[in-house]
Structures are given as structure tokens and as C-alpha cells.
Design a protein with these regions (language model features):
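Long hydrophobic alpha-helices with heptad-repeat/coiled-coil character
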Residues: 1-2, 34
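Metallocofactor- and cofactor-centric catalytic cores in central/energy metabolism, strongly enriched
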Residues: 14-124
């Protein structure tokens, strides 16, 4: 079972957030302030939150990878490729497939944890 599947289930269970979202990702956003019920592009709240979670994971990967590079340690090209893929999958109207986004989250967590282990091994 995917880690993020549980996260999404918890999000869906929260009655007060059931139909709410906040997405300010694109130029289509209503009045330039962000979509709060459903995206002008058609994105629903669950997909918006799943994308937010993926971007949170990408930020974590980026922070650790940056620290490794600042200490002149190698970071695999796969890390950069993952970041580009994850960012591209969140662009407007490109991917509303929650399952594929969750798979990326799971993969990202593995990458982040591997990088963290590498950093800890070097006392970074």
C-alpha cells in the first residue's frame, strides 16, 4: 500500500475539508487569487492536495541534494530527473491521475531517505 494512500484517505475523511481546496498554481486561477472549490482547469481538491504533497517531497529532496552538492558530494542524475518529472506532472491540465502522483510521492520519499542517509553518513 502506498504511504500517501493513507494520507489521502485521512484528507478525504476530514468533513470540514471535503469540498475545499486552495490551488494558486496557474494563470487560469479565478481572479488571480486561487481556486477554492474546484479548479477552473477541472482539478478537484484531492488532486490539488496530492500535488501539494508531491511538491513538499520534492522540496525535501532538493534541500538534501543541495547540501550534498555544497559539500562536493555526488548526487545521482536520477535525482535531478525525478525532480523534473515531478514538477512537470503538476503543471496545469497535464495530469489529474492521483494514483500516478502518489506513486511519484512514494518514489520521492525513497529518494529523499537515501539522500538523507548519505548526508548523515558524512555528518551533514
Amino acid at each position: 500500500m502506498y504511504f500517501c494512500t493513507k494520507v489521502i484517505e485521512i484528507i478525504k475523511m476530514r468533513k470540514d475539508m471535503e469540498n475545499n481546496m486552495f490551488c494558486f498554481q496557474c494563470q487560469e486561477t479565478a481572479k488571480g487569487f486561487g481556486c477554492t472549490l474546484k479548479g477552473v482547469c477541472g482539478k478537484n481538491a484531492t488532486t490539488a492536495r496530492t500535488m501539494d504533497l508531491l511538491l513538499f517531497v520534492v522540496r525535501g529532496i532538493s534541500v538534501v541534494a543541495d547540501q550534498l552538492r555544497q559539500h562536493s558530494l555526488p548526487v545521482k542524475k536520477d535525482v535531478d530527473n525525478f525532480i523534473v518529472d515531478a514538477l512537470f506532472c503538476t503543471i496545469t491540465n497535464a495530469n489529474f491521475d492521483d494514483e500516478s502522483i502518489m506513486k511519484r510521492i512514494d518514489k520521492g520519499l525513497v529518494i529523499r531517505n537515501d539522500l538523507k542517509h548519505q548526508a548523515f553518513a558524512k555528518d551533514i
